[in-house]
Regions:
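Acidic/histidine-rich, metal-coordinating catalytic segments
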Residues: 278-282
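Extended C-terminal subregions enriched in glycine
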Residues: 254-273, 277
Length: 348
């Protein structure tokens, strides 16, 4: 009888952060592709674009003028998804038509004045300033709101509407779905195991190594065992840290290095500006101890086979459960095989 081999046979993997299963079909990686293809950006961007709403010194669509900033620049989104003064929604006992008010704010973080440089092309010093800005925004907004979501959508394939490298921070008066799910499942694990889920997970991955993509003194980036997206990664501190605001100076500067190495490997994989959505999850600002939480960042890139072929979450994924072709170990191996020095910086 044929023995099960995860490299050859379909199987499911459990994501303890979401409580959901992922169908892995490694034998499908060899199938031919005749579907839609992305058009990778090949245009060389200038360091400053006079028509860009985010460049230093330019006027935005609202008429407000950006300062001549030299590092990061933060402003309230001109088309914010949340407002701080939303009135209370009327209460309803209808179990099928429930509604609640949502308050908050949405801000834009310009990573640097350089219109042409994404995260992997910035210096470690510039990336350290970005991490500091993430910390400052999280600390400020956490005084008012229970959940602060820092994130970046990189590339048109991920819906980014402006090519100037930037991220966002949204603060919510509520715990969003993903955060609520992670909070509940980490809490349940902590109650059962008396240790934080992702602290235990880091130790498992450090001992294994097959899914490691980047390791620095204080940080580990892996393709998680339960990855859904082809080259999805999870970036975690090696020690117990609740929030990004709790990082030491050493952890912060080392995080900048880890970010540069990880995003450089992404770009080097297909020699392109690798699109992704990424964001930070940490303990909510709810007045509790939250020892079950561990700070971490998710990177969700859509590309699958090349710079032009992406993964689509459709059909079976929408109606049944998420499916992937590459195993997490195969994806990590491919990312490890490329340099962590960006191809534009290495001269390759």
């Amino acid at each position: 009888m044929t023995q099960f081999n995860p490299v050859d046979h379909p199987h499911r993997r459990y994501n303890p952060l979401t409580g959901q299963w992922i169908l892995v079909s490694p034998h499908r990686a060899k199938r031919p592709w005749q579907g839609a293809q992305e058009t990778p950006a090949k245009q060389v961007l200038p360091a400053h674009d006079p028509d860009c709403f985010l460049c230093a010194g330019n006027v935005r669509v609202t008429g407000d003028k950006n300062p001549n900033y030299t590092e990061t620049y933060v402003f309230t989104n001109d088309f914010a998804a949340l407002m701080s003064d939303t009135p209370d929604a009327p209460e309803s006992n209808d179990p099928l038509m429930r509604c609640q008010s949502a308050r908050g704010t949405s801000r834009v973080i310009c990573f640097s004045p350089d219109h042409s440089k994404t995260l992997p092309e910035l210096s470690v010093a510039a990336l350290t300033e970005i991490v500091k800005t993430w910390q400052e925004q999280t600390a400020e907004l956490g005084k008012t709101y229970p959940w602060v979501q820092v994130f970046e959508n990189k590339g048109a394939a991920m819906g980014c509407s402006n090519p100037h490298p930037h991220g966002q921070v949204w603060a919510n008066s509520f715990l969003p779905n993903e955060a609520e799910r992670e909070d509940r499942l980490q809490r349940e694990y902590f109650a059962a195991q008396q240790s934080p889920m992702l602290v235990d997970y880091v130790q498992r991955e450090l001992a294994d190594g097959s899914r490691t993509v980047v390791e620095t003194e204080h940080w580990l980036a892996v393709v998680p065992y339960w990855a859904a997206w082809p080259f999805e990664t999870l970036l975690l501190p090696k020690t117990h840290v609740l929030r990004i605001t709790d990082l030491t100076d050493a952890q912060r500067s080392d995080l900048a290095l880890a970010l540069k190495k990880l995003t450089s490997r992404y770009d080097n994989l297909f020699q392109c500006s690798f699109p992704y959505s990424m964001g930070w999850h940490g303990a909510p600002f709810n007045g509790e101890e939250n020892q079950h939480w561990q700070l971490h960042a998710h990177f969700y890139p859509p590309l699958l086979r090349s710079a032009t072929v992406r993964k689509f979450m459709v059909g079976y994924e929408m109606l049944a459960e998420t499916q992937r072709d590459l195993t997490a170990e195969q994806a990590a191996e491919r990312l490890r095989a490329v340099s962590d020095i960006h191809f534009r910086e290495s001269g390759v």
